[in-house]
């Protein structure tokens, strides 16, 4: 064992050892993985870890450091079955699989696991999702079940219900999500569900007893996140087309006429216009308007001159166009998106962290977990993701405990869906932190008695 556990890690270790199946809700880069490995390293039965594909590498690094045997269940169904059988022949060790892996390998549910760990466990927050049903209906005989995440309630406090049904078989005494929702929530508009006041109290108490909750500030490891939002106006012609699309579900701009009758299609088209490209734009097309890329170039050649920077994108087309603009200005850059093979992604990340590229462009879905881009102290959001989990995960890609602060620069087009997303992210973050801080306070009070 090379690394000594920090004080808060030792406290978490004792909590998890005493409580058994638990939630482990601490922020990223605080060593959740190491605590779990130390906790379960003497287990004689196999241990299953389910994590985002991009986070599996971090587990492997820590398992190697701790000299623990591991097996990765990746590849085709035939390959996974063979690897699982070979690994189980040894009777113990760690088995790592991506969060979609159950579709190719449902036999996971039939293995006599000693422990099952869901890393970034908010992937089972939706009670209707097949992945949620798979993990909450199976593994009931596994003696130790854990959910790990820094954001257990990214959109709502209800996000935690199915996570605790996985770990404990119930949440506040309710064994399924729908009975919990019926008894514990109310709705003012017939659609949005909110916890009743008494239910909120019960939920805070339940979480404080059944999860270890800690943020960086409470652990003395806080890194200040400095946010400097840049508001960038559309040109009048594009603004007029945007407003018509928002009102009439039709995009009319020059020779372009597109109908977006479905809400999701309209929403995607509105976001695309905000990023500077047409919704239906094919590979090789240019900018519809270039306000954001000009702002980015001004920053890279001005305030951020000589600095390494991460730039986040929701859409691939503007990312490719930005790469071309940077090349034209002789600013060294690399990029990772879904088209880049996994091995090549890590090579490009290594190159960036080694100083071989000044800028790295990242598609949010590819880079939201498991990668480290700590060579940069600044992240620019060409488009902000609508989900709090993705936003916080992306922020933490450049975070190191040793840093005093990091700079986050969202690009926002005023009075658009982008502006709505920007404001909603702030509200979601405040709501999530308020609840978890109360759970932390309760646990601290219990511990002092």
Region annotations inferred by a language model:
Residues 73-82, 98-104, 125-128, 313-317, ...:
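Conserved helicase motor
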Residues 55-78, 167-171:
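Conserved helix-turn-beta segment of the N-terminal RecA-like "Helicase ATP-binding" lobe
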Residues 96-101, 106-112, 130-143, 173-285, ...:
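Inter-lobe coupling linker of SF2 helicases/translocases
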Residues 33, 102-107, 155-157, 319-323, ...:
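SF2 helicase motor core recognition
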Residues 28-29, 142-157:
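Conserved helicase ATPase motor motifs in RecA-like P-loop NTPase domains
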Residues 386-449:
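A conserved SF2-helicase RecA2
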Residues 35, 44-65, 154-159, 315-316:
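Conserved Walker A/P-loop ATP-binding site and its immediately adjacent core
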Residues 1-3, 17-21, 29-30, 35-44, ...:
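Conserved Helicase C-terminal RecA-like lobe
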């Amino acid at each position: 064992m090379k690394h000594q556990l920090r004080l808060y890690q030792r406290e978490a270790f004792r909590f998890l050892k005493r409580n058994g199946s638990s939630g482990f809700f601490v922020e990223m880069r605080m060593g959740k993985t190491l605590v779990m490995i130390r906790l379960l390293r003497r287990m004689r039965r196999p241990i299953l870890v389910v994590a985002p594909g991009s986070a599996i590498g971090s587990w492997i690094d820590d398992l190697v450091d701790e000299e623990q045997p591991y097996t990765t269940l990746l590849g085709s169904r035939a390959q996974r079955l063979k690897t699982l059988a070979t690994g189980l022949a040894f009777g113990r060790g760690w088995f790592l699989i991506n969060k979609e892996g159950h579709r190719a390998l449902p036999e996971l549910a039939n293995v006599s696991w000693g422990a099952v760990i869901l890393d970034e466990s908010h992937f089972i927050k939706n009670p209707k999702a097949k992945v949620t049903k798979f993990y909450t209906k199976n593994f009931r005989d596994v003696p130790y079940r854990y959910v790990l995440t820094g954001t257990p309630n990214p959109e709502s406090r209800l996000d935690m219900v199915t996570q605790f049904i996985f770990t404990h078989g119930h949440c506040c005494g309710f064994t399924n999500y729908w009975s919990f929702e019926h008894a514990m929530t109310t709705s003012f508009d017939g659609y949005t569900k909110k916890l009743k006041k008494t239910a909120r109290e019960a939920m805070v108490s339940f979480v404080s007893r059944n999860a270890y909750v800690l943020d960086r500030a409470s652990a003395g490891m806080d890194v200040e996140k400095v946010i400097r939002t840049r508001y960038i106006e559309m040109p009048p012609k594009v603004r007029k087309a945007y407003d018509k699309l928002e009102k009439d579900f039709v995009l009319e701009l020059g020779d372009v006429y597109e109908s977006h009758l479905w809400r999701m299609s309209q929403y995607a088209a509105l976001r695309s216009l905000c990023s500077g490209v047409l919704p239906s734009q094919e590979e090789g097309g240019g900018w519809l308007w270039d306000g954001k890329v000009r702002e980015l170039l001004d920053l890279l050649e001005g305030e951020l001159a000589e600095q390494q920077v991460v730039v986040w994108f929701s859409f691939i087309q503007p990312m490719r166009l930005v790469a071309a603009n940077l090349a034209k200005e002789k600013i060294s850059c690399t990029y990772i998106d879904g088209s880049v093979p996994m091995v090549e992604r890590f090579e490009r990340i290594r190159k960036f962290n080694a100083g071989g590229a000044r800028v790295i462009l990242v598609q949010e879905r590819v880079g939201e977990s498991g990668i480290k881009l700590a060579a940069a102290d600044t992240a620019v959001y060409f488009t902000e993701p609508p989900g709090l989990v993705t936003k916080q995960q992306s922020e933490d890609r450049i975070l190191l405990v040793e840093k005093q602060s990091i700079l986050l620069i969202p690009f926002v087009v005023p009075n658009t869906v982008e502006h709505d997303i920007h404001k909603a992210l702030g509200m979601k973050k405040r709501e999530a932190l308020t609840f978890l801080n109360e759970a932390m306070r309760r646990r601290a009070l219990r511990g002092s008695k």
